[in-house]
Amino acid sequence: MGLNLNYSYTDCLAIFGVGGAHPGGLQLTKELLSREKIDETTSILDAGCGTGQTSAYIAEQYRCKVTSLDCNKLMLDKARQRFLSLHSPIETQQGSTENLPFSEGIFDIILSESVISFTDVSLTIPEFKRVLKPNGVLLAIEMVLEKSLSEEELKTIVNFYGVSQILTENEWKTLFQRAKFKQVSVEKFNLQIDENNVQNATDFSLSENIDDEFFEILEKHMHFTKVYKDVLGFRLFRCCN
């Protein structure tokens, strides 16, 4: 399955406009948010918002202030179109989690769904801490390495997804603790997703005239998911500021 990739995995997600492109999807997001104290006064940052599926849900469900940030212009354009069609008063911002365009201490909750791995973790994690209010909460869903892989296999996966590295649960925990988060809890999920429930269906916002190469990337992603299903897992990291 050797591909001469002109595009990245994240380019592929943007072109297909995949919403909820993280383990557990919107179903997991709803579960996590339902545990937090959220009302109209809560300020939430959806960091790496993608096409805005999560942001739109939060704004509708909780009627609170939501800020949606993504570095990918195409993703953000699709998010804006979504918010416009729903008449959602969500603030959008193009920018990097490694250098957030916000002053410090302004968010109660930061939601980061399969985002940190695609960045320089040593920059993103301290930035999240900086913009959180005292006692604010970071909810991060991240890929973890469940079993060791050969150097070659690891390199193949890292290069394909464009992630900086693939970390174990303990390595993630250490990084959050080093950033001086007061409390770091880790949770493993075994979600039973009801495929027949229309709300759990993958959300797409397709671009026109999609290059064949994007379908090849999607196919390779499905291949990796199958081959490495026992090796690549995910965790929720809940970090209190």
Q: Predicted regions: what is each one?
A:
Residues 185-241:
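Conserved Class I S-adenosyl-L-methionine
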Residues 164-180:
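Short alpha-helix
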Residues 122-137:
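A short glycine-rich, Lys/Arg-flanked "PGG" loop and its adjoining helix->strand segment in the class I
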Residues 22-40:
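Conserved alpha-helix/loop element of class I SAM-dependent methyltransferases that forms part
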Residues 16, 143-163:
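Short, glycine-/aromatic-enriched active-site segment of Class I SAM-dependent methyltransferases
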Residues 109-121:
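A short SAM/SAH-binding and catalytic strip from SAM-dependent methyltransferases
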Residues 98-109:
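A short acidic, Gly/Pro-enriched loop at the edge of an enzyme's catalytic core
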Residues 45-47, 51-99:
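Class I SAM-dependent methyltransferase SAM/SAH-binding core
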